[in-house]
Curated annotation (Swiss-Prot):
Protein name: Exocyst complex component 4
Lineage of the organism: Eukaryota, Metazoa, Chordata, Craniata, Vertebrata
Job of this protein: Component of the exocyst complex involved in the docking of exocytic vesicles with fusion sites on the plasma membrane.
Assembly behavior: The exocyst complex is composed of EXOC1, EXOC2, EXOC3, EXOC4, EXOC5, EXOC6, EXOC7 and EXOC8. Interacts with BIRC6/bruce. Interacts with MYRIP. Interacts with SH3BP1; required for the localization of both SH3BP1 and the exocyst to the leading edge of migrating cells. Interacts with SLC6A9.
Major localization class: other
Gene: EXOC4
């Protein structure tokens, strides 16, 4: 048990320490330090027991694992043998290596010599290959340049020059080749820059021309010959910017997706098929040539000149296109071709700008990437491009708008120049008939000579264009020469009206491209604004003033009438004043300018107001010159000016009927009685207003030409008022369109202020009022003439005559009145429309009748011969008026019957009233009875006369009562 315990102790110790040497040292220390022999013996015994225990355990384990132990021992033996063999072999190899080393050491110098010779031979072979390749560079370079594979050519040339100036510098045989390739390298960038400019300015714009041709072919199939090539009102607004998609094929990437480093050149494809990629290749080639600064400088220097060449090419293209359509710009004023030119230039300049944005993107890549190994390269930007485009457009507009006034001094205005013949008026106001295409009987264009000649000329033009990038015209180029410059239309200020809206849209595109805010304007807008405000408006005003003054500042502006051609074109039946037509033409011209230059509508409307006001003043002065004599108005003008009289006359049915034709007037029962009552009211007012005063000759218009002038003024001012009202109503209507309707009208007019509209309406109304006053003056003047001649007839005439030859003659005053009325009728029939002519003479018979009947009180005496003479006077007046009015003029029968009533005695007159009833007023009967008392003998004393007068009044009252009773009975019956 003790042995087992000892063995367990030692096992545990061994297991804890896992170091037998440590256990042995511990036992030795215990034995050596112990003073007691017994303890040492005990320790020794425990140790021996432990060893024995270990031997037994080991024997048991060996017995238990004998097979495994045997196998392990055998395996160990085989491994040991193999290791021993390997050591022997390694030793042998080391000995062999040492032997080889010794042998190689002996051949070292010989091997080194051979190795160096091998390297030298290899280098020589490489140099020979390189020389052979360099000798082929000129030929390959020429092929690449011919096929326009410039990137490959650049790489080849740069590497060849580097080789010739590097490793092959000492090769004397390559000196000529070195000079040749060096010269090519020095000039290659010029070729690349030229190609870049060709794509920037010719290739990019050729697509625009091609698209326009395709559009023209399509439109020519569907459009009518009368439709203009370009309609300003249907232009797209705003035009879309030309993006980079125009410079790439369908399968290529856009510019923003291509980096300059990623651009590769495909030798199998046409390099110019994709313009965007081709320009990238050119920029990459220039970067490899380290010529980016020179490229930028060349682009900046050539920009303006290239843009001018685009203008020149486009001018010839537009003229050529117009020539092919059969238009001759040297004969016709064709501002439409200028519009076509500008539209083409806008598209081309947009294309150029888009191409420049592509190039700038590539140039910025060259600055950012270390491709060029250059620093501080200053590039241009898109603002520089747009500034040059604006400069070129300004120069073009300066020429076409004739801002230097090179032609205005020698040529009359194309817009406001009219000869006194009036043919130009007719041309202006004529309705433009749609032009029918003329069917030619035959053509020479398909003859062999024409075909060969056309083909030859077409080939010549194509060759010249491809060589210089500039379209060449024929012998005359179908262009207008002007100081070394060719134009598609005659330069003039009015060209701005056709191009204003497209130009304004292009300016908006420029400002959008430059990112300008509302507060900042581009130079082209400033140029346009300054031109219109400082030059165009003043020029228009000067032209208008010149034309209006030409017809209003004459000695007698109311005598100058438009000719028959103008009247026919205007559709008027009576002549108009030439000055009125000029003013109306001016107003229409200004309104057209307001639509063409909508941004300046207020200025043009103000001009309209000023010109109309000036013309109103002119007409007022001319009117006063006719109706005013020695600071005093003639009676007719004074009555027309009187508000009460004019209001009364305008309230009468004959004035209201004048506004509509007779066949359109509503039918009225007892219309004749109604109109007769109106005539009676008018006569009563006029007779009452004049009284028994005689009218001196200076208070009437004796000159028929003055009356004719008033008639012409009436017709002219009424026509002007109608035209201006129509124009102004269209203007106000156009401002009130709904948004849906406004989308179809491209006027873009700003709203017209209420003040201006009110002023325009008041001016139109004032012209109508003045026209009405002229007509009233004519209406009244004829009646004043009747007063002038017929009142002296009763007051100063001698009608107490005996029967003789003198009694058979008409009164001289009646003859003069008839003569005046006939002269006025002749003048009015030629100057006034029929219904106005009728207005002047209708009711005149009634007035004459009233004057003659009222004049009975002024006769001192009247005899039967005088009564007969008076009846003859009435008859001749009635006959004359009947010829004028084409009606019976029964009112004069009424006057004749009144004087025939004087054949009776005073008592017979009273009986006549009882028998026939009351036909005249009480006062008229009293005048007749009183005249009989003065004229006849044996009429009794004054008391008897008064008795008759009293009896007359009683009879009239009785007749009035009977008439009223009869009327009441009729009403009751109904």
């Amino acid at each position: 048990m003790a042995a087992e315990a000892a063995g367990g102790k030692y096992r545990s110790t061994v297991s804890k320490s896992k170091d037998p040497s440590g256990l042995l040292i511990s036992v030795i220390r215990t034995l050596s330090t112990s003073d007691d022999v017994e303890d040492r013996e005990n320790e020794k015994g425990r140790l021996e027991e432990a060893y024995e225990k270990c031997d037994r355990d080991l024997d048991e384990l060996i017995v238990q694992h004998y097979t495994e132990l045997t196998t392990a021992i055998r395996t160990y033996q085989s491994i040991t043998e193999r290791i021993t063999n390997s050591r022997n072999k390694i030793k042998q190899v080391k000995e062999n290596l040492l032997s080889c080393k010794m042998l190689l050491h002996c051949k070292r110098d010989e091997l080194r010599k051979l190795w160096i010779e091998g390297i030298e031979h290899k280098h020589v072979l490489n140099l020979l290959d390189e020389i052979e390749n360099i000798k082929q560079v000129p030929q390959k370079l020429e092929q690449c340049m011919a096929s326009k594979h410039y990137l490959s050519a650049t790489d080849m040339l740069v590497s060849a020059v580097e080789s010739l100036e590097g490793p092959l510098l000492q090769v004397e045989g390559l000196s000529d080749l070195r000079l040749e390739l060096h010269s090519k390298k020095m000039n290659l960038h010029l070729v690349l820059i030229d190609e870049l400019h060709r794509h920037l300015y010719i290739k990019s714009t050729s697509r625009v021309v091609q698209r326009n041709k395709e559009k023209g072919k399509i439109s020519s199939l569907v459009k009518d010959a009368s439709v203009p090539l370009i309609d300003v009102t249907n232009l797209p607004t705003p035009r879309k910017f030309l993006d980079t998609s125009h410079y790439s094929t369908a399968g290529s990437s856009s510019v923003r997706e291509i980096n300059l480093q990623d651009i590769k050149e495909d030798l199998e494809l046409d390099p110019e098929e994709n313009s965007t990629l081709f320009m990238g290749i050119l920029i990459k080639g220039l970067a490899k040539l380290k010529k980016i600064p020179e490229t930028v400088k060349a682009i900046i220097e050539r920009l303006e000149q290239e843009l001018k060449q685009i203008v020149k090419r486009s001018t010839t293209q537009v003229a050529d296109s117009g020539y092919q359509r059969g238009e001759n710009v040297t004969v016709e004023n064709q501002p439409r071709l200028l519009l076509e030119l500008l539209e083409l230039l806008f598209d081309k300049f947009n294309a150029v700008a888009a191409a420049h944005s592509v190039v700038l993107g590539y140039l910025q890549d060259t600055v950012v990437t270390p491709l060029t190994q250059q620093e501080d390269i200053k590039l241009y930007d898109m603002a520089d491009v747009w500034v040059k485009i604006q400069d070129v457009l300004q120069m073009l507009l300066t020429e076409y708008l004739d801002m230097k006034n090179t032609r205005t001094a020698s040529e009359p205005s194309a817009q406001l120049s009219y000869a006194s013949t009036g043919r130009e008026f007719a041309a202006f106001f004529a309705k433009k008939k749609p032009q029918r295409p003329k069917n030619s009987l035959f053509k020479f264009e398909s003859s062999s000579h024409a075909i060969s000649m056309s083909a030859y000329l077409r080939e010549q033009r194509r060759e010249l264009y491809s060589r210089s990038g500039e379209l060449q015209g024929g012998p005359d180029d179908n262009l207008i020469e002007g100081g070394g410059t060719k134009f598609v239309c005659k330069p003039g200020a009015r060209n701005i009206t056709v191009i204003f809206h497209p130009l304004l849209r292009f300016i908006q595109e420029i400002e959008h491209a430059l990112g300008l805010g509302p507060a900042k304007q581009c130079p082209l807008r400033e140029f346009l604004t300054v031109y219109i405000k400082n030059i165009f408006l003043n020029q228009v005003l000067a032209e208008i003033n010149k034309e209006i003054e030409g017809v209003t500042k004459t000695s007698d502006p109311l005598k100058i009438l438009a000719n028959a051609d103008t009247m026919k074109v205007l559709g008027v039946q009576r002549p108009l004043l030439q000055s009125t037509i000029i003013v109306e033409k001016t107003v229409q011209d200004l309104l057209n300018l307001m639509h063409d230059l909508s941004a300046y509508s207020d200025q043009f409307l103000n001009m309209v107001c000023v010109k109309l006001q000036e013309y109103k003043d002119t007409c007022t002065a001319a009117y006063r010159g006719i109706v005013q004599s020695e600071e005093k108005l003639v009676i007719s003008a004074s009555w027309a000016k009187d508000d009460d009289i004019s209001r009364l006359l305008k309230s009468l049915p004959n004035w209201m009927n004048m506004a509509q034709p007779k066949q359109l007037r509503p039918k009225r029962e007892e219309e004749e009685d109604f109109i007769r009552a109106a005539f009676g009211k008018e006569s009563e007012v006029l007779i009452g207003n004049l009284g028994d005063k005689l009218i001196p000759p200076q208070d009437i218009l004796r000159d028929v030409s003055d009356l004719k002038a008033l008639a012409n003024m009436h017709e002219s001012l009424e026509w002007l008022a109608s035209r201006t009202k129509s124009a102004f109503s269209n203007l106000s209507t156009s401002q009130m369109l709904s948004p849906a309707q406004d989308s179809h009208t491209n006027t873009d007019l700003p709203p017209v202020s209420e003040q201006i509209m009110q002023t325009l309406s008041e001016l139109a109304k004032s012209f109508q009022d003045m026209a009405d006053r002229c007509l009233l003056v004519l209406h009244l003047e004829v009646r004043v003439h009747c007063f002038h001649y017929l009142i002296p007839l009763a007051k100063e005439g001698n009608y107490a005559i005996v029967a003789n030859v003198e009694s058979m003659d008409y009164d001289p005053l009646v003859v003069k009145l008839n003569k005046d009325i006939s002269a006025i009728e002749e003048a009015m029939s030629a100057s006034l429309q029929q219904h106005k002519f009728q207005y002047i003479f209708e009711g005149l018979g009634h007035l004459i009748s009233c004057i003659l009947i009222n004049g009975a009180q002024y006769f001192r005496r009247i005899s039967e011969s005088g009564i007969k003479k008076m009846c003859r006077n009435i008859f001749v007046l009635q006959q004359n008026l009947t010829n004028i009015t084409m009606s019976r003029e029964a009112d004069l029968d009424f006057a004749r019957q009144y004087y025939e009533m004087l054949y009776n005695t005073a008592d017979e007159l009273l009986n006549l009233v009882v028998d026939q009833g009351v036909k005249y007023t009480e006062l008229e009967y009293i005048h007749a009875l009183t005249l009989l008392h003065r004229s006849q003998t044996g009429v009794g004393e004054l008391t008897t006369q008064n008795t008759r007068l009293q009896r007359l009044k009683e009879i009239i009252c009785e007749q009035a009562a009977i008439k009223q009773a009869t009327k009441d009975k009729k009403i009751t019956t109904v």
